Amino acid sequence: GYLGGYAAPAVAVAPAPALAVAHAPAVVVATSYARISQVTNSVPIAVAAPAVPKAAVPVAAPVVAAAPVIAAHAPLALGHGFGYGGYH
């Protein structure tokens, strides 16, 4: 899932507490999306994506929001054999 794809690599390669703190917001966001996905089954998420059906939000919104972060971490992730969101 998102938490496994985004948070696990950060935690696994973070040698210093400062890195863990820096990545904490991403963990919160991923966890929030997971909870929203469970709670709202067919209701559009107005704040995150007003014009996108709820079913597409858990996939589209986090990926779009995380794209710059994924790009920034790609060399590190690839170097360690991690796959973001299950994609290698």
Swiss-Prot record:
Consequence of changing F82Y: In isoform LM-70B
GO MF annotation list: structural constituent of cuticle
Superkingdom of the organism of origin: Eukaryota
Sequence repeats: 7-10, 48-51, 55-58, 60-63, 66-69
Keywords annotated in UniProt: Cuticle, Repeat
Protein function: Component of the cuticle of migratory locust which contains more than 100 different structural proteins.
Note from the entry: The sequence shown here is that of isoform LM-70A.
Comment, domains: The tetrapeptide (A-A-P-[AV]) repeats found throughout the protein are also present in many proteins constituting the protective envelope of other species.
Record protein name field: Cuticle protein 70, isoforms A and B
